[in-house]
């Protein structure tokens, strides 16, 4: 089921998600609905806050991206595509390398792209849909997507990385989104 997407300036986007404590069929259904919603809106990541839920849950799928990603599981290289989609459930991150600038968009900010400083690599502890912990390290575009979604789970938005001057430069775009005048891109249907 396609869920209603929450756009900027909805207050839920500023809420830190509550930990997930039930790894049941409801969680599995929600994850499936979030994946369908993310695909419908042509995204690579979607946090629970973006569908109006105050949870520590995000879904990511970078398998269709042309941008380079890397993944280490148990310290060994793994094929990124084989581990997509990826679920972040009650995640914690450790940032492992220097920063680089990433040009990012966000489903909650239709049409807006900004440059954001991100760590080149992240170490992640998360849980699978059965509640089992697992650990991995990500680099490249996957690392960026994870950091972007993790920020959502903390109530932080990518515009928070902008200076006051940079925010002033995009003020009209933000006002358009608030007024509902921004156009969302959706998946073509047959």
From Swiss-Prot:
Q: What is its EC number?
A: 3.5.1.88
This protein's species is: Methylacidiphilum infernorum (isolate V4)
Q: What is this protein called?
A: Peptide deformylase
> Which Pfam families does the record cross-reference, listed alphabetically?
Pep_deformylase
| Catalyses which reaction(s) | N-terminal N-formyl-L-methionyl-[peptide] + H2O = N-terminal L-methionyl-[peptide] + formate
User: What is annotated as the active site?
Assistant: 149
Q: What lineage, starting at the top, does this entry show? A: Bacteria, Pseudomonadati, Verrucomicrobiota, Methylacidiphilae, Methylacidiphilales
Q: Which domain of life is it from?
A: Bacteria
Report the cofactors. Fe(2+)
């Amino acid at each position: 089921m396609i869920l209603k997407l929450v756009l900027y300036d909805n207050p839920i986007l500023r809420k830190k998600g509550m930990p997930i404590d039930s790894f049941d069929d409801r969680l599995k259904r929600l994850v499936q609905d979030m994946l369908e919603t993310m695909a419908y809106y042509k995204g690579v990541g979607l946090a629970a806050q973006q569908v109006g839920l105050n949870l520590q849950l995000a879904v990511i799928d970078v398998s269709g991206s042309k941008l380079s990603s890397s993944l280490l599981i148990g310290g060994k290289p793994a094929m990124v595509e084989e581990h997509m989609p990826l679920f972040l459930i009650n995640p914690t991150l450790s940032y492992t390398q220097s920063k680089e600038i990433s040009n990012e968009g966000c489903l909650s900010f239709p049409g807006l792209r900004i440059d954001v400083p991100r760590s080149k690599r992240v170490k992640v502890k998360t849980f699978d849909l059965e509640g089992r912990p697992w650990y991995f390290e990500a680099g490249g575009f996957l690392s960026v997507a994870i950091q972007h979604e993790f920020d959502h789970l903390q109530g932080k938005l990518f515009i928070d990385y902008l200076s006051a001057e940079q925010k002033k430069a995009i003020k009209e775009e933000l006002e358009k989104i608030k007024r509902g005048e921004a156009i969302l891109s959706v998946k073509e249907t047959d």
